């Protein structure tokens, strides 16, 4: 039996995406992201006209072939960036707490 077409439909309210605070610190990059940022242009130069998705795939394959010793500089950068993020996040939360107390 078909439903009555004139019956009101229930609609679900969408809450939407929460706006990101522009003053919030940027997230820390992983070792792979540092590697990808350093090597993306070289992959594009070696393969002119390569599609965006294929660049990521090539970077992933190249990352997998690296030895642990070759990954060390990227892991050190990631560790330093993680510390930077944690420090900035702590300062941001402290400032947010002070701002909330003032209101």
Curated annotation (Swiss-Prot):
Positions of the UniProt region annotated as Disordered: 1-27
SMART domains recorded: HMG
Subcellular location: Nucleus; Chromosome
Main location: nucleus
InterPro entries: HMG_box_dom, HMG_box_dom_sf, HMGB
Keyword Oxidoreductase: no
Gene3D superfamilies to which the protein is assigned, alphabetical: High mobility group box domain (1.10.30.10)
Function comment: DNA-binding protein that induces severe bending of DNA. Required for DNA-binding by the FACT complex, a general chromatin factor that acts to reorganize nucleosomes. The FACT complex is involved in multiple processes that require DNA as a template such as mRNA elongation, DNA replication and DNA repair. Also augments the fidelity of transcription by RNA polymerase III independently of any role in the FACT complex.
Protein name stated in the entry: Non-histone chromosomal protein 6
Species of origin: Yarrowia lipolytica (strain CLIB 122 / E 150) (Yeast)
């Amino acid at each position: 039996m078909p439903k009555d077409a004139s019956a009101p439909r229930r609609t679900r309210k969408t809450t939407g995406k929460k706006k990101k605070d522009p003053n919030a610190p940027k997230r820390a990059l992983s070792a792979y992201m540092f590697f990808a940022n350093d090597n993306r242009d070289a992959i594009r130069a070696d393969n002119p006209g390569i599609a965006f998705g294929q660049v990521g795939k090539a970077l992933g394959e190249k990352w997998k072939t690296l030895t642990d010793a070759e990954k060390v500089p990227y892991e050190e950068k990631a560790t330093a960036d993680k510390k930077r993020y944690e420090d900035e996040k702590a300062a941001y939360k402290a400032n947010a707490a002070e701002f909330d107390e003032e209101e």
